[in-house]
From Swiss-Prot:
A GO CC term assigned to this protein in UniProt: nucleus
Annotated PROSITE patterns: SAP, ZF_RING_1, ZF_RING_2, ZF_UBZ4
GO terms for biological process, alphabetical: DNA repair; mitotic recombination; postreplication repair; protein monoubiquitination
Protein name: Postreplication repair E3 ubiquitin-protein ligase rad18
First and last residues of each zinc finger (RING-type): 30-68
Keywords (A to Z) from UniProt: DNA damage, DNA repair, DNA-binding, Metal-binding, Nucleus, Transferase, Ubl conjugation pathway, Zinc, Zinc-finger
Intrachain S-S bonds: none
Gene: uvsH
A GO molecular-function descriptor: single-stranded DNA binding
Amino acid sequence: MEPTFDIPDSTDWLDTPLTLLAPFETSLRCQVCKDFFDNPVITSCSHTFCSLCIRRCLSTEGKCPTCRSSDQELKLRRNWVVQELVEGFKNARPSILQLARMAQTGTDDSGDLAAEEPASKKRKIEPNAIVGTDGLPEEGIRTRSQSRGASRQPQATPVQVIDDGNDEDYMPDGLVPCPVCGRRMKEEAVFRHLDSCTGTAEELKPAAFGSLAPGPRKSFLAATGKPPERLPVINYSLLKDTVLRKKLKDLGIPNWGPRALLQRRHTEWLNLWNANCDSRTPKPKRELLRELDVWERTQGGNSVTPTDPTNAVMNKDFNTEEWSANYDTDFKALIANARKKNDAVIRSTIPNASQANSDTPRSAQLVDQPIEASLTPQDVDEKSTMNPQDAIDNRTEVPPVPDPPQALSGIDRAVNSPMKNVTEGDAQAIPISSSASTHKTPH
């Protein structure tokens, strides 16, 4: 059978006649943890929270959880009135709730009984009742007040049964009581005990170390005699890793893990320690270390994160083909958008990239194509009858070609060479295009 947990909540009053206590109890609960205030403190914006809850919020966001206004940890002040209200209500809550539920049950039962009772409410006197000389009823008849008083009378105390020595199941323990204080002890120790016996029974002492029964817990204030001092907030950006690890070691908390984990661990320890300073009965350090260990296993370095490879396990019934078919359109759209962005980046970084790409085949065609291939038979005849001097003068009409190939190196040598070194054979060796033959320089 699974255990049931009775968690107190403000909605417990809604099923009772005291429904107005529901909003009252809600006002005594923290808006962060939804539990009764524990060491309540008030902020600069006049909102009350648990000391640990508001310190965690301020260390993370620096804002009030209720009104979202900026606040600082140094401005927090203890709210003793709310603490006393919470303690008093927590002590009286079980009794008040029990009485309210009993009243609700009694009201329902009385309504059912009233429906079953007849209209006449006259009482009949029993015939064998005996009436006294003074006119008061005797034991045969009891009035309502007498019945009520009899029900309030305490019942008889239970009779104490003394074991008889003749009982078969009696097992003597070999101890005898002291005739003065009644303490049981061995027979040979009675005489030594009588010399120091005061006549009163000694009170039971708390369990010693190593016993199964735990002794009463002492607070930090009772153990040390002075309240704990608050820890200051430090700027982690000014501390190196070695200094930060040494500071954690001096505080008695773990100093392993990366720098981010060290900062989170130190911040949590500051919140636990300073919140404990707001309590009337501070906890000992070992309990705070136990709470830090719980945080370590749930949110710290020992917690199970979603990035753990042991948890990255796909469902065995997962259908990859169906998933791909359902989201194929989305995948194609993402790929198309990625290509468009890539082309846009290329055009933005190289403005003439598209124009250069379109002109590249034409330039290659002009370079690779021989000049003689573009000549007509008429141009060939004109070339044969052309004056060498005209060919030299028309050399400037040839359009410049960027990065000329080796086939045109002869033209460059002819153009760049001095005029006096040009012979008739060199002039005839220079190929002339159709454009050059049509645009002749007049003499």
